[in-house]
Amino acid sequence: MLGWVQRVLPQPPGTPRKTKMQEEEEVEPEPEMEAEVEPEPNPEEAETESESMPPEESFKEEEVAVADPSPQETKEAALTSTISLRAQGAEISEMNSPSRRVLTWLMKGVEKVIPQPVHSITEDPAQILGHGSTGDTGCTDEPNEALEAQDTRPGLRLLLWLEQNLERVLPQPPKSSEVWRDEPAVATGAASDPAPPGRPQEMGPKLQARETPSLPTPIPLQPKEEPKEAPAPEPQPGSQAQTSSLPPTRDPARLVAWVLHRLEMALPQPVLHGKIGEQEPDSPGICDVQTISILPGGQVEPDLVLEEVEPPWEDAHQDVSTSPQGTEVVPAYEEENKAVEKMPRELSRIEEEKEDEEEEEEEEEEEEEEEVTEVLLDSCVVSQVGVGQSEEDGTRPQSTSDQKLWEEVGEEAKKEAEEKAKEEAEEVAEEEAEKEPQDWAETKEEPEAEAEAASSGVPATKQHPEVQVEDTDADSCPLMAEENPPSTVLPPPSPAKSDTLIVPSSASGTHRKKLPSEDDEAEELKALSPAESPVVAWSDPTTPKDTDGQDRAASTASTNSAIINDRLQELVKLFKERTEKVKEKLIDPDVTSDEESPKPSPAKKAPEPAPDTKPAEAEPVEEEHYCDMLCCKFKHRPWKKYQFPQSIDPLTNLMYVLWLFFVVMAWNWNCWLIPVRWAFPYQTPDNIHHWLLMDYLCDLIYFLDITVFQTRLQFVRGGDIITDKKDMRNNYLKSRRFKMDLLSLLPLDFLYLKVGVNPLLRLPRCLKYMAFFEFNSRLESILSKAYVYRVIRTTAYLLYSLHLNSCLYYWASAYQGLGSTHWVYDGVGNSYIRCYYFAVKTLITIGGLPDPKTLFEIVFQLLNYFTGVFAFSVMIGQMRDVVGAATAGQTYYRSCMDSTVKYMNFYKIPKSVQNRVKTWYEYTWHSQGMLDESELMVQLPDKMRLDLAIDVNYNIVSKVALFQGCDRQMIFDMLKRLRSVVYLPNDYVCKKGEIGREMYIIQAGQVQVLGGPDGKSVLVTLKAGSVFGEISLLAVGGGNRRTANVVAHGFTNLFILDKKDLNEILVHYPESQKLLRKKARRMLRSNNKPKEEKSVLILPPRAGTPKLFNAALAMTGKMGGKGAKGGKLAHLRARLKELAALEAAAKQQELVEQAKSSQDVKGEEGSAAPDQHTHPKEAATDPPAPRTPPEPPGSPPSSPPPASLGRPEGEEEGPAEPEEHSVRICMSPGPEPGEQILSVKMPEEREEKAE
């Protein structure tokens, strides 16, 4: 009957083994059921439970939820224990009645079909025994039985069932926080310990309400055995008064009062604030411990059914400080206010989805799951830590099974589960309305931590091990939002070691209102701090958990702190660099650092010409060809394989032009000799075979041209060059040229068989004139001086017209008869030459010709005159055009020269300047062939101009150091803007102080940079490839004036780039612009750096002192300076010492200059002025030169030593001098930074003696 219910309702994931007691119960035919009375729930608890369930899911809770008995009902049951004893007899009689048996059978069947909650963890056996033997939990059986006996009537039972479901439908206020503060005493399992004196007396009854009526204690192993009564706590006076005020049991007024009382409890009541501050703020919290008994042989790792409940305290903001072991007390009234605001919560959809999954599994294994065993759980005592926490607001441990369950949930499963759940709920609701609801364990936030005994309890033994669960993150995940960060110190380990599972809890707020995916959970885990990171670890009896946990926390914290420190240091470094860059830009906006300057595009090498690559390709081919002759083996050049091209380019292929030359020669043979053979008697039977041989050779050339060459010529169609063989052949066959070529090869030679060999039959061979014109155009395109060929061709036209006229004259003479008249040819001499002479005189109309006598002669002569005038006029005009085109450049040059000379004469320019201008015209014309190259480039497109500029100027511009590293395309654009200018010898290219608007690149020749005081000293000579004028052109540092004079040394050809053109180019290349400015700034800085000029000696360095003079000075020193000679010698001696001092100072100055120049080469920046000033000061502060002892007489004479201490070390000492002739030499800075003053001082006494 209930098979469909079993298939519809979800079943537990595993089927545990049946105990012996269960087997015995199944054998019994009619088990006796203890009368169970639905206890009256506490109003506060009932309201709390009704709040935890939304209205839309109430119908589901009607089937599975059971209300806990309230403390007041428990007290009433304890006071009326005698009434319960009397009611047992009536209960047994009612149970034995037929209607009661049907209900009992129906209840037993439903209990077997409806799945029971599955729990995975148990307590220690010691704790279970303690719960069962003594304590407050043992007091729940007797009063419950008494109440059951009181409320066993079916009508009253139905009312209780309606009331219970009404309470679950309507929202209720949250449970007082006092209950949660008193629960840890029960969770410890120490029943023998009395309650603390400071706690109120109502603690015991409220804790009894935590027990479910269907959870018997583990002590009574037999169903009918009753536990020993434990001393019950004193009931409240208020509850006693309430009990005593009610009417008798059978009175109808009692029923009405009871209904009104139940309605009051069912309807929502105002929130009553509990007592606060009963727990000391510094008292340590206790970890949540759940003790669950696992039957032997069951699943080792049972699947846990998890439920997600939205926490009401997610958005709460309270000032709560944490202690190392637990959280501080939260005011109860604040928590209740927050709980009222968060009353509507959603129940998890996981249960519905799990039911669908289990339904599919049970359909496949229908036969095996008909006999479902009940899971026997010893007890479920859950203690929560914290003040102001409601039962539904506890945190739930997050385990690996939770994560697997989240992964299994999908969007499609949600929709299907909701649809199926609605259909099933309607069917189940109709059937459950006819029977009593079953006693189920209340579904809470932690379904894996709560359990329920179906029929009887089994104590924990060796066969029934226990596993203790500890919530290790009680302080890291407080129930209320805290301002202070959670403590990273782990709580002390649990006393149980080998059977403890450490489950750190995680804030459930991260999983609310949606089912997170695997990626979302990974991101949330990464976002957690080391104290909040969920870690699941099985304890090891050999490893202390506290040390391991602290090490993990410390290592994680140290890793995070190291990463944060590295990141902060990196940010500080970046900020410093950015600050320095901003400062640098504020000081000089044009300054760019090396990092900002773009990396120049790698300079691509110009493509190598094709002839250079061909030998490289041919080398490996040559290595393969060897020739073995006799005893030696040598390599020989392989035979080149010539293959006729598949297509021929008629514009650039020189072989085709050569072939056209042969075709034109054949055509000229026919055009010149056919008239001669027809008119003159030069073709005779004796030489006929020679004439025919040449004729047919020309015909073969014609035929090859038509069949081989013309059918392979490329052509342009739609802008594309067609190289397909079929298309080229079709193109030729459809052209006019093919028709003319075909007519030129008409086989009229077969008529020779009838009329004989007549040259006029070959006259169609002259129709191949189109090949002649094509040859002329191709030849002119490849000739450097095409006008020469044009002149020759024009002359040929004139000669051919004379040739035809001579042939006609001989034919006319032969027609009338040779020598018949005075006008005709008389037949004397060479007939062709005499006729040709007559034709020349006739066409040119020289005169002196014989007068025609006959009509034929007159008509023929008139035709000659008209032909001659027309032909010669055309020839002369064409000749003029040809010659004019050949000398057009020279004519332009002369016209420009004449205009310039006329201009200079008009303004009376000096002859020297005029001569320089004329020289420039002549040199420019002869060197370039034109005066201005830009005029030639104007007609060409940009691409061709760029190609020409690259070939002409790229090799020179690429050598310029200033443009190295710049964009290659920028250099190409710059090449098109360059102008070529020729400078004559000693011409000033630019002068110092002028405004710089151009930059110069030397193409050919040399220029000299002048400087010095007079501005005529040659500082440096620049050769081809050098550049100057770029600093003023780039206007770096605000200066755009020339810094030196530049003069052309000889004829110099320069490329000029205007400032305007360069700026237009650099606009499109900002990276190259920065690079050029940076280079120009460095060059300007190096040029402006003060260079130390070599000190000019007052007196030139003297030559070495003669030995004889030194000997004389030595003798004078001995004599002691007596007489005039002694005074003169002393004066000379002092003079020599001055010269020696000057020489030493000059050497010291040279050493200083060398040191500073080496520093400049290394690139060290800084002013050299301070260095220049330090040395003179040191020399000025030097003490006087020490007096040298007199020189011994036998010492060899040598040059006197310098008096300055600044001479280089290692220099040999001079000869010893007398003391009275010592002097003091000082170096002091001059008024200008680069000047120094040398002063020579003598003591006053010595000066007097010297005088």
Swiss-Prot record:
Stretches with biased composition (Acidic residues): 23-50, 353-373, 424-434
List of residues binding 3',5'-cyclic GMP: G1029, E1030, S1032, R1042, T1043
Superkingdom as given in the UniProt entry: Eukaryota
UniProt membrane topology term: Multi-pass membrane protein
CDD domains, per the entry: CAP_ED
Stated consequence of mutating R880G: Increases channel conductance
BP GO terms, sorted: calcium ion transport; detection of chemical stimulus involved in sensory perception of smell; detection of light stimulus involved in visual perception; G protein-coupled receptor signaling pathway; membrane depolarization; monoatomic cation transmembrane transport; monoatomic cation transport; olfactory nerve maturation
Region called Cyclic nucleotide-binding domain, residue ranges: 968-1084
GO cellular component: ciliary membrane; Golgi-associated vesicle membrane; intracellular cyclic nucleotide activated cation channel complex; non-motile cilium membrane; photoreceptor outer segment; plasma membrane; rod photoreceptor outer segment; terminal bouton
Cytoplasmic side: 1-656, 710-724, 774-785, 885-1251
Positions bearing the site annotation: Occludes the pore below the central gate: R880
Region described as Calmodulin-binding CaM2: 1148-1154
Region (Ion conduction pathway): 786-885
GO molecular function, one term: cGMP binding
UniProt: 3',5'-cyclic AMP binding residues: R1042
Entry's family note: Belongs to the cyclic nucleotide-gated cation channel (TC 1.A.1.5) family. CNGB1 subfamily.
Illness the protein is tied to: Retinitis pigmentosa 45: A retinal dystrophy belonging to the group of pigmentary retinopathies. Retinitis pigmentosa is characterized by retinal pigment deposits visible on fundus examination and primary loss of rod photoreceptor cells followed by secondary loss of cone photoreceptors. Patients typically have night vision blindness and loss of midperipheral visual field. As their condition progresses, they lose their far peripheral visual field and eventually central vision as well.
Oligomeric form and interacting partners: The rod cyclic nucleotide-gated channel is a heterotetramer composed of CNGA1 and CNGB1 subunits with 3:1 stoichiometry. CNGA1:CNGB1 channel binds Ca(2+)-bound CALM1 via CaM1 and CaM2 regions of the CNGB1 subunit; this interaction modulates the affinity of the channel for cNMPs in response to intracellular Ca(2+) levels. The olfactory cyclic nucleotide-gated channel is a heterotetramer composed of CNGA2, CNGA4 and CNGB1 subunits with 2:1:1 stoichiometry.
Note on domains (UniProt): The cyclic nucleotide-binding domain (CNBD) comprises three helices and a beta-roll of eight beta-strands from CNGA1 and CNGB1 subunits. Upon cNMP binding transmits the conformational changes to the C-linker domain of the S6 helix to open the ion conduction pathway.
Name of this chain's protein: Cyclic nucleotide-gated channel beta-1
Organism: Homo sapiens (Human)
Primary gene name: CNGB1
